[in-house]
Every structure is written in structure tokens, then in C-alpha cells.
Regions:
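Catalytic cores of TIM-barrel enzymes
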Residues: 1-148
């Protein structure tokens, strides 16, 4: 039987030790556990391609920052210790609709987003309550506030 002191820590134990400024068995890994540790959807699509992962799809849960929802296969591949409890809308297809990232890669975005092409200036505009709220100009990678 293995000595419990030499068993690897669980993700929870590892993160708790790090927060308490104690030395864990390795550094905790976070990839998309919260918005500030997220990964841009275009980078995520390229990461999946580099790893040879063809299953699943790129889903953008934060349009402004273009953040991707990191799939379980990628989390597992990197031994990620921190996961998000709030990013996902779920797997149901009716919750997502197709779109293309600025580099042309197919993705899915939340179905409830009122996203319209800007016929005058090019790019895209996100509308809420009849007002243009965020805009992605041609050549840009992110949405910015449309109303200041």
C-alpha cells in the first residue's frame, strides 16, 4: 500500500494549498476557470488543431472578449485543476447558433445574442433592447462598447 503522504494531491487540495501559501505537489493549472484566465476562441481553435483534437466545437461564451468554453478533453489533457461553474449554457443545440470567428473558423455563440452584420461600416454589432451595445469593426478581434 502506498504511503498517503506520497500520493498526488487532488485538484481541490492543490488549489487550497496554493491559496494558503503552502507548497503543493505541483503548481495548480487554470485554463478558463474564470474570465481573466480564459482563452480567446481563435487561440483555442488553433490549440485544438495543434493537439490534433477534432471532436467537439469551439463555443464562445463571452462575445466581448471572444472567450472560448474549454472542453473537458482539453482540461484533462493539461491536468487543469480549476474549472468554471458559470460559463456554460449547456450542451443543448438550441442554446447555441453558428457564427464565424474573425479568422474564419466556425464556432457557436449563445443563441440569445442579437448579432447583426453592420451593412454600413462592415463588421458586426450586438444589439440589446433596440440599442447597439457592442461593435466589432472589420479587422478587429474583439467587440468594444458601442455606446459610451
Amino acid at each position: 500500500m502506498k504511503d498517503p503522504a506520497h500520493l498526488p494531491l487532488t485538484s481541490r487540495e492543490r488549489v487550497r494549498k496554493a491559496i494558503r501559501h503552502e507548497e503543493p505537489d505541483r503548481l495548480p493549472i487554470d485554463l478558463g476557470g474564470m474570465a481573466s484566465t480564459g482563452i480567446m476562441a481563435m487561440a483555442y481553435a488553433r490549440l485544438k488543431a495543434h493537439l490534433g483534437l477534432t471532436s467537439g466545437e469551439v463555443r464562445v461564451f463571452d462575445m466581448g472578449q471572444q472567450l472560448a468554453e474549454v472542453e473537458a478533453e482539453v482540461l484533462s489533457r493539461f491536468g487543469v485543476d480549476v474549472i468554471s461553474l458559470t460559463n456554460s449554457l449547456g450542451e443543448a443545440p438550441e442554446l447555441w447558433k453558428p457564427w464565424k470567428l474573425p479568422d474564419g473558423v466556425d464556432c457557436r455563440i449563445p443563441a440569445g445574442i442579437d448579432l447583426r452584420p453592420d451593412e454600413e461600416k462592415g463588421g458586426w454589432t450586438i444589439w440589446e433592447n433596440g440599442l447597439p451595445m457592442q461593435r466589432m469593426s472589420p479587422g478587429n478581434l474583439y467587440f468594444s462598447e458601442a455606446i459610451h
